[in-house]
Every structure is written in structure tokens, then in C-alpha cells.
Curated annotation (Swiss-Prot):
Lineage: Bacteria, Bacillati, Bacillota, Bacilli, Lactobacillales
Gene: luxS
Domain of life assignment: Bacteria
Descriptive protein name: S-ribosylhomocysteine lyase
Function as written in the Swiss-Prot or TrEMBL entry: Involved in the synthesis of autoinducer 2 (AI-2) which is secreted by bacteria and is used to communicate both the cell density and the metabolic potential of the environment. The regulation of gene expression in response to changes in cell density is called quorum sensing. Catalyzes the transformation of S-ribosylhomocysteine (RHC) to homocysteine (HC) and 4,5-dihydroxy-2,3-pentadione (DPD).
Record organism: Levilactobacillus brevis (strain ATCC 367 / BCRC 12310 / CIP 105137 / JCM 1170 / LMG 11437 / NCIMB 947 / NCTC 947) (Lactobacillus brevis)
Main enzyme class: lyase
GO BP terms in the entry: quorum sensing
Reactions mediated catalytically: S-(5-deoxy-D-ribos-5-yl)-L-homocysteine = (S)-4,5-dihydroxypentane-2,3-dione + L-homocysteine
Residue runs in coiled coils: none
Ligand binding (Fe cation): H54, H58, C124
UniProt-listed SUPFAM superfamilies: LuxS/MPP-like metallohydrolase
Keyword annotations of the record: Autoinducer synthesis, Iron, Lyase, Metal-binding, Quorum sensing
Length: 157
């Protein structure tokens, strides 16, 4: 079986919340994609409940695109501690951390239920599993800790 980089990361050594570049790859036509680890809570110490995480996912899908160019996808980790962010080109972890911070701030302080996209049976495969209250509370807690541009040393932006 192929080795997956995310499973070789020492999850006991990282200090969440942080942004980490997992990989940067160049396609056969020269296009560059980057995969970032947006770790919101400390692995094996916490996990965001699915309803809150699901709502954060839907909001990040739009807000990150408002904050930075080149967003392809932002998908939650199965362990519920953060997200993969896939982008075109070569953004720095600091650029991504700033976009993430701004997006989480919008969720925590500016978002109302009407702002959450994809919350009906036609636009979401699990539309009943959302909580804006949970999303806001988790985002406030994450922002209070500060988002680091480095996974191993706290370099809060």
C-alpha cells in the first residue's frame, strides 16, 4: 500500500491550531496544486462535533474563496480536527493562515443562519446535521488560541 504523508505525521508533536503545507505537486502540463493541513484542534485531545464541523465546512467553502484565489476544495478530516485545503499555485502557509483566520472570524462573529449555503435536502447530502451555534463557538475558541503558520512551533499570525 502506498504511504500517505498525513499518516506519517507525528500527531503528538504538532501544536494546533496551525496551517501546514502537506505537499505541492506539479502536473504533466505544469500546473501546480498545493495541499494544506488546516488543523483547528489538537489531535487526540479534541474533535469538533459533526454538526459544527459540517457547518464550518459549508462556510469555509465560500469564505476561503472570498479571502484567497485558487481554492479548489476544502474538506474535513475524518478525525474531525481540521480540513484539507487544496489550491492552485503556491500560496505560503502565512497567506493561507491569514485567509483562514479571516474566514473563522466571519463565522464566529458575522454569520447568520441565512448565510450558510447548502442546508436543504436538494443541496446537501446530510442537511439535518448542521449547527451554526456549534460552529461559532468552536471558531471563537480556535481564534482565541491563535492560528500558527508552523505546525511544530507557535508562530501565530
Amino acid at each position: 500500500m502506498a504511504k500517505v504523508e498525513s499518516f506519517t505525521l507525528d500527531h503528538t508533536a504538532v501544536k494546533a491550531p496551525y496551517v501546514r503545507l502537506i505537499t505541492r505537486e506539479t502536473g504533466t502540463k505544469g500546473d501546480v496544486i498545493s495541499n494544506f493541513d488546516l488543523r483547528l484542534v489538537q489531535p487526540n485531545e479534541n474533535a469538533i462535533p459533526t454538526a459544527g464541523l459540517h457547518t464550518i465546512e459549508h462556510l469555509l467553502a465560500g469564505y476561503l474563496r472570498d479571502e484567497m484565489s485558487g481554492v479548489i476544495d476544502c474538506s474535513p478530516f475524518g478525525c474531525r480536527t481540521g480540513f484539507h485545503l487544496i489550491t492552485w499555485d503556491e500560496q505560503s502557509t502565512e497567506e493561507v493562515a491569514k485567509a483562514l483566520k479571516a474566514s473563522l472570524h466571519r463565522i464566529a462573529y458575522d454569520t447568520e443562519w441565512k448565510d450558510v449555503q447548502g442546508t436543504d435536502k436538494y443541496s446537501c447530502g446530510n442537511y439535518r446535521d448542521h449547527s451554526l451555534f456549534s460552529a461559532k463557538e468552536w471558531c471563537k475558541a480556535i481564534l482565541d488560541e491563535g492560528i500558527s503558520k508552523d505546525p511544530f512551533t507557535r508562530e501565530v499570525i
